[in-house]
Each structure stands twice: as structure tokens, then as C-alpha cells.
Amino acid sequence: MAADEARSVSRLHSEEDMHGKHHSTLWGDFFLHHVPCRPGQYSIMKDNVKIMKEEVKKMLLDVGSSDLSHKLECIDTLERLGLDYHYTKEIDELMCNVFEARDQDLDLTTTSQLFYLLRKHGYHVSSDVFLKFGDDKGDIVTDDARCLLRMYEAAHVRVNGEEILDNILIHTKRQLQCIVDDLEPTLQEEVRYALETPLFRRLNRVQARQFISTYEKSTTRNNMLLEFSKLDFNILLTLYCEELKDLTMWWKEFQAQANTAIYARDRMVEMHFWMMGVFFEPQYSYSRKMLTQLFMIVSVLDDLYDSHCTTEEGNAFTAALQRWDEEGVEQCPTYLRTLYTNIRATVKAIEEDLNLQNNKHAKLVKGLIIDMAMCYNAETEWRDKKYVPATVDEHLKISARSSGCMHLVSQGFISMGDVATSEALEWASTYPKIVRAVCIIARLANDIMSYKREASNNTMVSTVQTCAKEYGTTTVEQAIEKIRELIEEAWMDITHECLRQPQPMALLERAVNLARTMDFLYKDVDGYTDSRSIKGILDSLYVDIID
């Protein structure tokens, strides 16, 4: 009896802590009623986009016979405006032409843009292309701000061991920071944005929304491209809102029946944003909805194991999920039995949807929930034993997996249907280098942002503490700086794998998109937990139509 009372008091304190550190939802029922545009407007927008899409396709055919610099600018503009997904085939052909013509005598600005785009698209191009621009000491000196910006972006698609790109990054970052306040407004805006988030690491929709505003101010803009990008953005925004209406209804029912509000973060809209960062294209509407449902369950499990259930309850609940039958949960308290029933109901509905789509991988879905629960339960053992792993690598063997990124990539592949083969799913399940790199970025970036909160909340020891122990650093700041170096190494691994291409770029790009999403969410704060910090961005992507 005393033990039960102690657990109840402990749980009460946990719930008080939960409400103290996690704000309530910012959205409520908003998307049940929000209609960005009238049906008639939506139909007109789609008709106009269809016409403009064909016009741009003709333009791309003409660009094929233009000079290299014009090709690069055209591709770069389409990508920044978020229109490139309409022209995958055409851009692939242009990039092939660009690669074949790469040995031309180009200036430093064009060389930097060429290098960036080729590497971004998975082409092997040596960083030695920059050697000819160095002085007697090997330093590349220029005071042209646009050139510095192009070099800075190029340096962010480096791989381990490319000293020349390491030096370019250090030099250009320092110089851009020094001159940014003196630049003309449009270029100043571009440089500030680049210093905050390099082009290669930006989310497609966030980048498109920002660049549409910048492009509108350009004296050399193509007005048809500008109008096309606005309409396309608004069409996707409207589609996302339709998805959020369906998801809001599902989440309200799940939350009410499972009674998760007392301990779990209410972040359904933010979760949709997370999934939209990985799959933004209109054809992946089902992927976004399916993944949002699954990872809202994962988010609930994270909070459940982290601060609500006792160790004994966590063990029993994990065992029940592993059995995945009605009898398995009998040893759990009522609130966990209810949660268990609702989790199984959601997973069953997803499996049925996938079966209707003739998706042969439907049976793999429940494995995500089971494996994530096992990861979270394993972490509680470290917490209870107050165990500090000796090395960051040891820590990451468990904690990187519990970031959920490997599971998200695998489940994302499943949701893509025939786009992802059985071989691709098997590859993803082996924890390949690019997926490991994404998991590392997610875990380390999360730990940097959540260190202070978790250090005072008796949760699992973070990689920050482990790093301090491994490297003998005397301050948290030194440990965090080392963690940031590990994050940069992970980004270089991502670039390396995109050049090696163990799978088609169409699949690898999902892993890269996930890394970009994690970078965004955990750049300055934990944007998922404290979603007030990203509310303005979410408004611009879900609420505010572009005029």
C-alpha cells in the first residue's frame, strides 16, 4: 500500500512537472473550421497552375540549349521557389548536361554554384575545382558578397577530409558575418538566412515561403514563375489543411478515449509539420496522415515512459505490446489498458488502409510501435540506475534509435507504396550509414536543447553529460561544442552517402529531408515541445494564403 501511495505521489509530481514544462495545444479545433480558400477559388488556382506548369516545361526545354550559367540559375530558382518537384525528369536531364559541361573555364561564383548543385543532386565532383582560385598560400580571397555566399553554400556539401572546403567554410562564414550589416537589403536578407540555415539544410516549404517574398523584390524576376510559385504554395497549403481536418477528428477521439492529455504533449499539428518536412509533395498526402498518426502515438509513448508510468508499469506495458493481443495487457492498470486498446485500433485501421492499397508491407507497421516502446523502456533502466554511459558512441547505440528516425524512414518507405521496393525496406532496417547519421543529428540536437530541462527532471542522462565525461570537458558549453562537431560530421556522412547512392535518390532524399526537419525543430529551442517558438512559421505554412 505504501509503495502504491508513493508511486501515486511520484506520478502526481510528474504530472505537475509535465504541465509546468509543456504548454497546451496552440490549435485546438482550429482546423475543423479553417478554410483557406473557397472551393471555386481552389478550382481556379488548379486550372491556372496546370497552364503555367506547361509553360515552364517549355521554358526548361529552351534552357537546355542555353549557356551553363543560365542552366544553373534556372535550376536554382525553381528549387528555391519549391517548384522543382514538378520537373524531376527535366531537371535530371539538365543536371546531366551540366555535369558533362563541368570542365569549362568558369569564374569562382559560377564554380561554387555548379559544385553545390552537382553535389546536391548526387554527382561526384572533386573539391579540387577550387584549387585554381587560391593564392600562393592556398587561400581564396574575394570581397564579392554574392561570391562569398555561393562559396559558403558550396562548403556545406562537403564530406570528411576535404580540407579546402573546411577552410572555405571558416573563411566565408567569418567574412559574411563581418559584412552582412552593410549589404543592400535583399542580399542582406539572403545572407542572414544562410548564416542561420545553409541552403542544403532548409525545409522545402519553409524555404519556398521565404524565397517567394525575396524573389518578388527582385528586378530580374520572371513574373510567371512568381505567380506559379504563389498558386502552387497556396494549393499545397489548402491540401495540408484538409489533412489536418481529418487528423484533428482522429486525434480528438484518440486523446479523449486514451486520456493522454494529463501527461502527453498535444502536438498533432506540429507532428504533421514534421511529416510534411519529409513528404511535402501532394502525391504523399496519405503518407503525411499515416505517419502523423503513428508518430503521435510514438510521442505519447515518449512522454509516458519519460515522466508518467512507473518502471513496473513500463515493463508490463512493453511486454503487452510485444505480445500484441488482448490478453497481454491484463497485468497493466486501467489507463494503460485503454491506451493499449486505442493504439491497436489505430494501427489496425492503418493496416486496413494499406491492404486496400495493395501494399504488401502493411504487417510491418505495428513493429514501429513495439520497437519504439522497447527503446523507451530500455532508457528508463539507465535512468533508474543513474547510469552514465562511458562514451557518446555507447549512448547513441540506444538513444539514437529512440529518436525514431530509423523507424520514420522505414514507415515512410512503406507509405510510398511501389516507389519503395522490398529491397529498399530491408536496406532501411539495417540501420545504414545515412539513417544512422540522421538519427545522430536528431538525438544530439534534441539533447542540446533539452539538456537543462532534463538534467533537473531526473530523466535519462543526456549525450551532453556523457560527452563531458568522455572528453573530460570542464563546462557544459565545451561539451555542447563537441556535440555540435559530431552533428557536422553526421551531415558530412549524409552528403557522402548521397554521392555513393546505395539506394535511388528519390528514397535517400527522404532521409535528408528528415535531417533537415530535425535541424529546423531543434535549432534554437525544442520547437516540438515548445511549439510557440515555431507558431509564426506554422501560420505561414497552414493559415496565411499568399496574395
Swiss-Prot record:
SUPFAM superfamilies: Terpenoid cyclases/Protein prenyltransferases, Terpenoid synthases. GO terms for cellular component: cytoplasm. This is (E)-beta-caryophyllene synthase. Mg(2+) 2 binds at D302, D306. Mg(2+) 3 binds at N446, E454. One of its GO terms (biological process) is diterpenoid biosynthetic process. Component of the volatile terpenes biosynthesis pathways. Sesquiterpene synthase that converts farnesyl diphosphate to (E)-beta-caryophyllene. Involved in indirect defense by producing volatile signals attracting natural enemies of herbivores. Pathway: Secondary metabolite biosynthesis; terpenoid biosynthesis.
